[in-house]
Structures are given as structure tokens and as C-alpha cells.
Regions:
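Sec-dependent bacterial lipoprotein signal peptides
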Residues: 1-18
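Acidic, polar-rich low-complexity tracts and alpha-helical solenoid repeat scaffolds
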Residues: 18-191
Length: 191
């Protein structure tokens, strides 16, 4: 008798706990508020056009969460990276591009992802003020190394891509910066 009373009480507590969690209205609402991926993408484009980049990125992230297999999700990932780049959020943009390249290694837009990743790393290595005040070879060159490896990987992976055409010139410039950096290190230790 006591045993069945204890079991009944535990069952009642368990069921009451389940009903508490199930009553949350927000948890049952769909992520995309019933919007199609196309409608979300158009909303994001409108946000970008009006200068609300963060809100546009949020709409694209909803596409990634709600419709990960759609064609809009593929483009959304690239658009997120590009707009993060425009906002100077370089690390987040590179993470997005790395995910894109890992997920879609053979799409026609993949060479663009490789190229944009290199451009972002190159841009990350300098700012307007840095170009005026210091020689780029005298600063930390990790971003320059990253840009060089990203561009070299683009040429190795997609040698016939239109994005590979101007990369050899970029590689020469980056290699010269790295060589000057090594030269400054040698000067420092020899003086």
C-alpha cells in the first residue's frame, strides 16, 4: 500500500513537471515564423540595402537554422561571411567561410569562398592607420601568412577559376612582406 502510494506520488510529480515544460508557447513557435527560405532571404537583402547589416545577418542565420538544406542556406552562408567582412568582424567571417568550404567543397561558388577568405585575412593584416605609420613587415604577420596560405590553396584547388587569375600577384606581394619581416628579425638579432 505504501509502495503504491509512493509510486503514485512520483508519477504525479513527473507528469506535473512535463506539463510545465510543454506549456511554453514560444518553444512551439517555428524558428522562421512560417516564412519560406526565399522570403527570409529577401528580408535579409532588404535589411542589407537599408544598412541594417546585423539584422540582415540574423535573417540569414534563421535560414541556416530552419532550412539548412535549401539553396538559400548555401548562399546565406556566403552572404553572412561577406557582411561580417564589411563589418570588420574578420574572425567570424573566416569561420563562416571555413564551414562553407568544409560543407560544399565542389560547388561553383566554392572558389569564391576561398578567394574571399584570402582577401579577409589580407585585410585583417592591415588597416589604413597601420599603412601610414608602420611598415607591414614590422607588425605581426600571422594574418599575412594566413592570407598567403589561403590564396595558395585557392590556386592549388581551383587553378582554372576566375578567382585564381589575380592571386599570383597577391602571392608575390604577401611573400615580399613575409621576406621583409624575416629581414627585420635578422637585423634585430644581429645588431
Amino acid at each position: 500500500m505504501i509502495r503504491s502510494l509512493i509510486l503514485s506520488t512520483l508519477l504525479l510529480i513527473f507528469l506535473a513537471g512535463c506539463s510545465i515544460f510543454g506549456s511554453d508557447k514560444q518553444a512551439r513557435e517555428p524558428i522562421a515564423d512560417g516564412l519560406t527560405p526565399k522570403a527570409l532571404y529577401e528580408l535579409a537583402e532588404d535589411k542589407f540595402s537599408s544598412g541594417s547589416i546585423e539584422q540582415g545577418i540574423e535573417k540569414l542565420e534563421v535560414i541556416l537554422a530552419a532550412y539548412p538544406g535549401s539553396k538559400y542556406a548555401i548562399q546565406a552562408r556566403l552572404d553572412i561571411a561577406y557582411n561580417l567582412f564589411k563589418r570588420k568582424k574578420y574572425n567570424r567571417a573566416i569561420i563562416q567561410l571555413n564551414e562553407f568550404i568544409d560543407r560544399y567543397p565542389a560547388l561553383p561558388s566554392t572558389p569564391y569562398a576561398y578567394y574571399l577568405r584570402g582577401v579577409i585575412a589580407e585585410e585583417k593584416s592591415s588597416s589604413i592607420l597601420d599603412k601610414i605609420l608602420t611598415d607591414s613587415a614590422q607588425r605581426d604577420v600571422q594574418s599575412v601568412r594566413d592570407a598567403y596560405s589561403y590564396f595558395a590553396l585557392l590556386i592549388d584547388t581551383f587553378p582554372n577559376s576566375k578567382y585564381s587569375e589575380e592571386v599570383p600577384k597577391k602571392l608575390i606581394i604577401l611573400k615580399n612582406i613575409l621576406a621583409k619581416h624575416e629581414f627585420y628579425i635578422a637585423l634585430y638579432y644581429t645588431s
